[in-house]
A protein has these predicted regions:
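Membrane-helix interface segments in multi-pass membrane proteins
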Residues: 3, 7, 95-116, 213-247, ...
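Membrane-interface extramembranous regions at the lipid-water interface
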Residues: 3-40, 55-90, 125-155, 173-208, ...
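Active-site-proximal cofactor/substrate-binding loop regions of enzyme domains
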Residues: 33, 45, 52, 74, ...
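Pore-lining and gate-forming transmembrane alpha-helices of multi-pass membrane transport proteins
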Residues: 37, 113, 204-208, 232-244, ...
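Hydrophobic alpha-helical transmembrane segments of multi-pass integral membrane proteins
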Residues: 44, 85-99, 116-123, 157-162, ...
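Selective recognition of hydrophobic, aromatic-rich stretches within alpha-helical transmembrane segments
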Residues: 46-60, 105-134, 163-184, 229-258, ...
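Hydrophobic alpha-helical segments of membrane proteins
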Residues: 205-221, 249-257, 283, 290-291, ...
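Long, low-complexity, intrinsically disordered cytosolic termini of multi-pass membrane proteins
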Residues: 292, 330-346
């Protein structure tokens, strides 16, 4: 009997493994092809005094979304240029009013900035709602169902607590931000679920601090010992090098953690970025951008996108086609425009 139960359990596990399909993300863009889009966007934006920037944004997004594939199907970017242009016009007007009032009437300006601070969570929510509902995969749109109170917490309260705790609560603040964004996002009618634990965030921050201190000490010893730089110059260079490595480590570690900790119903994700692989791509990009006086920038964006997508997988258990597209949410036009203009992207 025990043997029979063991065999049945083994068969069930085998069936479960066989029913899972690992789908790799793939970016099929080309650096030379994107360069043509990039250079035309810059030229037209300049000669139209910035008006074409809305069309440039749409062209860029449609290129990158349309060249990102999963299971043979690409993503789609649905936003229209005029939606973005209206938002940017409103943003310029609001910004000009703020600057003008702050200069002429400092007290009134301070009050308006305070109002903007309280409006930021609303703008953030509307911005993400706009971006998500203008992103689709297999003709099913994404959604973002934001809550003002939660947004205020992750944008204002938790960062403030991180500040007054001298950074000790920053890992928890970042966890709250990731939880809010992922748990409020849906594909069709199905919500994403984010299950990362706070200890993972503290572990990453701890390693990051260790890398920072280690590089600072090593760089200072090498630079001071060589006699090529003054102590102040050595400190500045060491700080710059340490900053680059720590930011790179955080990018790799948190990208992996967010994907691994995110699920969509029974479907899961995996990310396997490595510090070595990412640093290699970043250093090559920086070198070629400097050598080409910035002309390699479009190809650099394509190169980093290719690397990141090549390290991301969707573990499909069942069929994604079973998801039902949610009805389009009626997002306030003013909220969309302000959010798009102020570009509250994470």
């Amino acid at each position: 009997m025990a043997q029979l139960e063991t065999d049945l359990k083994s068969n069930n596990e085998t069936t479960q493994v066989e029913s899972e399909r690992v789908l790799s993300f793939e970016f099929r863009g080309d650096g030379a092809e994107y360069f043509k889009i990039w250079i035309v966007n810059i030229f037209l934006t300049l000669i139209t005094l910035g008006i074409y920037s809305a069309w440039a944004t749409v062209r860029n997004n449609r290129y990158f979304y349309g060249n990102t594939f999963v299971d043979g199907t690409s993503f789609s970017y649905l936003a229209k240029p005029l939606q973005i242009l209206k938002g940017r016009i409103i943003a310029v007007v609001v910004f000009a009013l703020f600057v003008g009032l702050a200069g002429a009437f400092p007290i009134a300006g301070a009050i308006l900035y305070l109002v903007l601070g309280f409006a930021a969570p609303y703008i953030y929510n509307q911005s993400l709602a706009f971006k998500m509902r203008n992103t689709s995969y297999k003709n099913i749109q994404f959604r973002f169902n934001g809550d003002y109170g939660e947004a205020f917490g992750v944008l204002v309260i938790w960062p403030f607590l991180g500040l007054i705790s001298l950074g000790l609560l920053y890992p928890l603040a970042l966890l709250k931000m990731h939880q809010y964004r992922m748990n409020q996002t849906a594909y069709g009618t199905t919500q994403f679920v984010f299950s990362a634990q706070v200890k993972s965030y503290y572990k990453i921050f701890g390693i990051g601090v260790g890398i920072l201190l280690g590089i600072l000490v090593l760089a200072m010893l090498v630079l001071n010992g060589s006699g090529l730089m003054s102590p102040n110059g050595a400190a500045v260079l060491a700080g710059f090098v340490a900053y680059i490595f720590v930011v790179t480590y955080f990018t790799v570690a948190f990208t992996n953690l967010v994907f691994i900790s995110t699920s969509l119903k029974e479907h899961g994700f995996n990310a396997t970025l490595t510090l070595r692989g990412y640093v290699k791509v970043v250093l090559i990009n920086m070198l070629l951008i400097v050598i080409t006086l910035g002309l390699y920038l479009p190809a650099a964006k394509v190169r980093i996108m290719k690397y990141i997508t090549s390290c991301i997988e969707l573990h499909e258990r069942g069929s994604l086609d079973d998801f039902i597209a949610a009805e389009k949410e009626s997002v306030s036009a003013l909220g969309e425009q302000l959010g798009d203009v102020f570009d509250f992207s994470v």
